[in-house]
Regions:
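Histidine-acidic metal/acid-base catalytic patches
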Residues: 2, 7-118
């Protein structure tokens, strides 16, 4: 399983993992990262939960990650499994439906460009 947000914050190259171990990628979670929020949380030694509540994660298209290389790697390795769009943030700060729609729109555009379509 690959989770783009967790991989990015851990300093893991998700694209490299996908390309090196395509048979081990059975499920993909995509979420974006707000690096400034993450950095501020690290500076104050906040907990992971505090970081989530502060908004270090967001839907694809609303943060700092580039999803084109991820989707391209999935297409190149003929990935045919689920891609789950995650919008992990406080619903009081960002409407879940709006953020989910943004994530889906972002991933659909990248998937079409990479010819990763069902």
């Amino acid at each position: 399983m690959i989770d783009t947000g967790h991989a990015a914050l851990a300093g893991v190259d998700a694209v490299g993992l996908i390309r090196r171990h395509p048979r081990r990628v059975a499920h993909v979670h995509v979420k974006d990262v707000r690096r400034a929020v993450f950095g501020a949380c690290q500076a104050r030694r906040a907990s992971f939960l505090d970081g989530v509540v502060a908004g270090m994660f967001t839907a694809p298209g609303d943060g700092d990650l580039d999803f084109e290389p991820v989707v391209r790697a999935l297409a190149d390795t003929r990935y045919a499994g689920w891609i789950v769009v995650e919008a992990e943030q406080d619903p009081k700060l960002a409407d879940p439906r709006t953020m989910s729609a943004l994530g889906l729109k972002t991933l659909r555009a990248e998937a079409a460009a990479a010819s990763l379509v069902p």
